[in-house]
Every structure is written in structure tokens, then in C-alpha cells.
Amino acid sequence: MSKTEKNALDLLKGAYNLITPDDNKKYYEGFAPFYDSVFVKDLGYTYPTVVANLLVEKFTIDGPICDIGCGTGLVANEIKKKAPNAVIDGVDISQDMIQISREKKLYRNLLELNLEDHLDSLLQDYSAVVSAGTFTHGHLGSETLKRLISHFNSGTKFVIGINFDHYHSKGFEKQFKALNETNIIDCFELNEVKVYNKDNKNLNIKNGKACVCLFSKT
């Protein structure tokens, strides 16, 4: 394992200890400057590419897209490769990550927001909502996702990535079943994907898979 891979892994381990919104802000304050160069490059973090491709390939997007937990703009960058004219707004809890996104000029608007707070400042009228990495570390649960889904207008399409273990152990699977059975969402599709394109066994990465959920709000 290279030194840069080890540094990236040390940072990744820290992410799974995040509990409060302040924990997240402090963590990404230190992570933001080299998130792309170390974490993405050295660990082969391809999750944003997978999520963006599913959005573009599975849905017809005829309006603005909301990128929840936009970070440094990795998902938006991949969407723009296939849909250069896409209009994307980004939402993230970390002002430091948002600043890097802003410099890339990928987004129409960028909003600093804690998803556990009121969502009044978040627009409701989006063609699609996409997220890769927000529901990963366990601090945001299925009830937060349910509240987020309810915020957006009927007809909104969703591509939401969730940590594989947490999907099954922290109530997401049951939540989606309930949402589907009560006709709050429809056209539900589950995709199990790899988060990294490198050998997770050699890198000793936990949680190397994710469940990407595609659905529409009725």
C-alpha cells in the first residue's frame, strides 16, 4: 500500500466516526483541500460516476437536478460529461466542500444545509434528485431520507446511494418497502454497486459496496 493510499484510508476511517453536524463540518474542513486528489484518485472512488451514469441512463431529465451532499462536485462533473446542458443545484453541509464546487463552476446554485434542519431554503421543483455519499456513514438515517423525499414535488425522480450494510441494518430497506406499499413512491429499482474500482481486499476498505435506489415520487 502506498503512503497516499494509507493517508486516504486514515481519512476514510475518520468518516465512519461522524455523529453530529458539527463533526461533519470539522471533518470536511480538513478533508476538502485534497479530497479529489487523495481520496478519489488514490482509493479509486468511482461511486459518483456510477450514480451519475444511472441517473442519465435510466431517466429522462427535463428540468433542474438537485445534488444532495454535493461535496466537491464529483457527481455533477460526471453528469455534465453525458448531459453538458444539465442545470444542477448543489446542497452540502460543508462550506469548505461547497467552496471547491463553486470554483469548478458546475452548479447553478449552491446551498449550505444540514438535512436534519428545516428544509425551507431548499427548492421543491426539481426534475431529479441525486445523491452519492450522503447516506454512507450512518449519521443520517431512513427517517431523514423519508423527510427529504416528502419535501420534493410529485413526479420527481430519485437516484439515491446508500451504504450497503446500512441499507439492510439501519431501516432503509424497510422504509422503502413502506413508501412503495403506501404509494408515496413507485418504479422502485435497487442496484448493488462497487464504491471503488480498486481491490478493496488489498486496501482493507470497509463497506466497499452501496445500494443505489432509483424511484419516482408519486
Q: What are the roles of these predicted feature ranges?
A:
Residues 155-164:
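Conserved beta-strand signature within the Rossmann-like core of class I S-adenosyl-L-methionine
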Residues 116, 127-141:
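A short SAM/SAH-binding and catalytic strip from SAM-dependent methyltransferases
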Residues 143-154:
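A short glycine-rich, Lys/Arg-flanked "PGG" loop and its adjoining helix->strand segment in the class I
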Residues 66-119:
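Class I SAM-dependent methyltransferase SAM/SAH-binding core
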Residues 44-62:
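Conserved alpha-helix/loop element of class I SAM-dependent methyltransferases that forms part
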Residues 32-46:
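Class I SAM-dependent methyltransferase Rossmann-like catalytic core
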Residues 1-34:
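N-terminal, positively charged/glycine-rich alpha-helical extensions of SAM-dependent methyltransferases
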Residues 184-218:
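Class I S-adenosyl-L-methionine
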